[in-house]
Amino acid sequence: MKRFLTILGLCALPLTLTAPQMAAADGATDAVFSVAIRGITAGTLTVKGSESGGSYKASGVLQSGGLVGLVAKVKYTASASGRVKGNTFSPSRYDEKADTGKRKSSASMTYKGGVPSVSDYVAGPNVVKPSTQKGTVDPMTALYAAFRDVNKDEVCKLDVKMYDGKRRSQVKLATPRADGDMIKCDGEYRRLAGFSSEDMAEKSRFPFNLYYAKTADGRYRVEKVVTHTLYGNAVMKRK
């Protein structure tokens, strides 16, 4: 399940939200980002979500494009739903489908009492047991939590832990500051558990910057993400 996020080479965005609970208005997010790695167009990421009456629904599509798309046709889709209160998400279901051009696969997670149950769980030496991951969120919920439109007092306030069915990781946003007409955040993705010793030795922390811009209705939306990845410098820009 990690591929929906890690395929970007963008630090696998994701994520129990521990940031202070704020009063967030019901609303919707509909964003399309171009993805470029080392200046080469790699594809697009679409993130959609809505919140109403304490519930949320979110979906995303990651698809290869540009020169990368000529080499490999890759498409990942995911959806998630659950409850939301302020900045705290409690997922109830997550579904993912992947088409790598060579094979197709699907996976899902459901939650009971905040504990995930994985459809394709297979125990292994590095695999984190789902029964130990109470309070974590799925990759799509994590992505939506990081990329949704927010009020000004919620900008750069995120500290979430994610479980993808095998691995546990964390994403933090902090230090909001003006950068031209946008607000810049410092972010970090951290591998926590379930990764091989080689992966941890190679790199366990991935810094990035996220940029918000003010919208016509006075809220703030993500316009750009910049990071250094194992694949080179990566930039996501909102279309």
Language-model features, listed with the residues they occupy:
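Bacterial N-terminal signal peptides that target proteins for export
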Residues: 1-9
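Surface-exposed, polar helix/loop patches in the mature regions of secreted/periplasmic/lumenal proteins
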Residues: 89-145
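Intrinsically disordered, low-complexity regions of eukaryotic proteins
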Residues: 2, 21-23, 122, 140
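Compact, aliphatic and Gly/Pro-tolerant "microcore" segments centered on a short helix or tight beta-hairpin
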Residues: 8, 22-25
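C-terminal segment of classical bacterial N-terminal signal peptides
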Residues: 14-22
